[in-house]
Amino acid sequence: MAKIKKHTPPPGWKNPLAPQQPLASARWLLGGVAATVGLAAVCVYITFCLLFWQGQWQLVFKPSRTVTATPATAGMKFDEISFDATETGILQLNGWWIPAQPNAPYATDTLLLLHDGSGSLSDSLPQLQALHTLGINVFAFDYRGFGKSLDVHPSEATTYEDADAAWRYLTDTRHLSPSRIVLDGVGLGAAIAAETARRHQQAPALILEDPLPPVLDSLHFDARTHILPIRLLFHDRFDPTETLARLRTPKLMVYSAHQAAGRYYAMAAEPKQQAIIANGQDHLNSLRSFLGKYLPGA
């Protein structure tokens, strides 16, 4: 009988029919799932942060592209002005020049109004009408992103640029003396007016009406912002505190008794005045007194 020779497999050979080791343990699978879910959560959070960073302007500004009324609606003469041309010749900003009567008390002076960052110039019409009764030329305009001005997303930086452009229009195009231009900011515009006064300290006076608290302070009341690193992401601060503490331009702060704007007044450098308005009182007398004190030759 022939002897069967035993076959020796080559080194490294494994029998495919032999029992196999499990491909993965349950712990490994759970770890992989957890890592995937964690990575997805991080990606979602980063995406949320990026979306917030891109759309944060909507928490600050409430622009309208509609101009429903003009000074003529209120019986005032005015000129519609387009100014601040780009390198390609596009006029970016649109505003209204409302002249004072030739024999008015401040016929050679101008008040540059910086509105509150909501609506359009039409929404400022009641205030423009009141300011016109002071007997001073009034120039008001819409920031980019508002009214008939260039359609872009506004930001703190662009509003400061637009205020500078309005100042240049008055001094370079209309050839007005900087010492005859009073800055008046309302709401959010108060911070813009303060920054403009810092950049153009030839202005004889600065009026801040109903100044808002810094934007970051206001955002703490918005629950959507509690899960995000707001101070890292938010670049629109509108905080005039430090500027007002150093600025030597005469200031008038007009605000309601219930507002927190009094802290601006407490920290502001002299000279300064305040008018606390309660129960719908008229603040025009305070404005008249302030203008009479600080406008040259008034």
What are these regions (language model features)?
Residues 262-298:
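C-terminal catalytic histidine-bearing segment of alpha/beta-hydrolase fold enzymes
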Residues 169-173, 178-226, 235:
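Primarily recognizes the serine-hydrolase "nucleophile elbow" in alpha/beta-hydrolase
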Residues 88-170:
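Membrane-embedded segments
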Residues 257-261:
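Acidic catalytic loop of the alpha/beta-hydrolase fold
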